[in-house]
Amino acid sequence: MENEKRYESYVLIHNIAKRHNVGTLARSCTAFGVSELILVGRRDFNAFGSHGSTSHLNFRHFNSLSLAKSFLKERDCDICGVEITDDAVAVNQHPFKRSTAFLLGNEGTGLSAKECEICDFFVYIPQYGCGTASLNVTVAASIVLHHFGVWAGFSERTREGNKFVVAERPTKQERKNYCAETTESIVEERRLKRENTSNGFFDESVKDDSSSNLLDGLFDS
């Protein structure tokens, strides 16, 4: 389909605090046709929740936001911040012009000033109920990516029965050194994070103190 080849979507995330969120985010990226998931800063994450979708998704890593921005601009790609700002446009208005990378903010504090500086425009997700001030980052990403796919004219995936057909995994796969935590450790991590509400999805203060870069074989560079 012409539009599918013409436009691409990317997801951009910066200095992950909740590493296991990337697994569920990767699942949404594959469902909505994202070309690449770009990590900036920290790159150690857990594939928990991805249901194998990381095998069908391209990853890329940069050490700084400026390098990520340069990469995207070389591909004539806009950077869209998903944030409620004075000039943000409702995502259902589809204010897209070309291939777009979506930068998602902290569920508690939103995008930092540094992150906002690299954005070309902003979208927000209208809410119609009064019980919450924000959405989980993966839920927000899914809504925004779906709207972009509709605007870009992406082809709907073939269905079989009550599910969509999953493509075969690539025969040649790079080494994927996922953070090999157990389900129990993830549950415990989530419990501790709930007790410490200051931890958000992005956290500029988080230091990567892992003994090695856990995904050296996963990223294009």
Give residue ranges: language-model regions:
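Post-transcriptional modification and biogenesis factors for structured RNAs
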Residues: 1-221
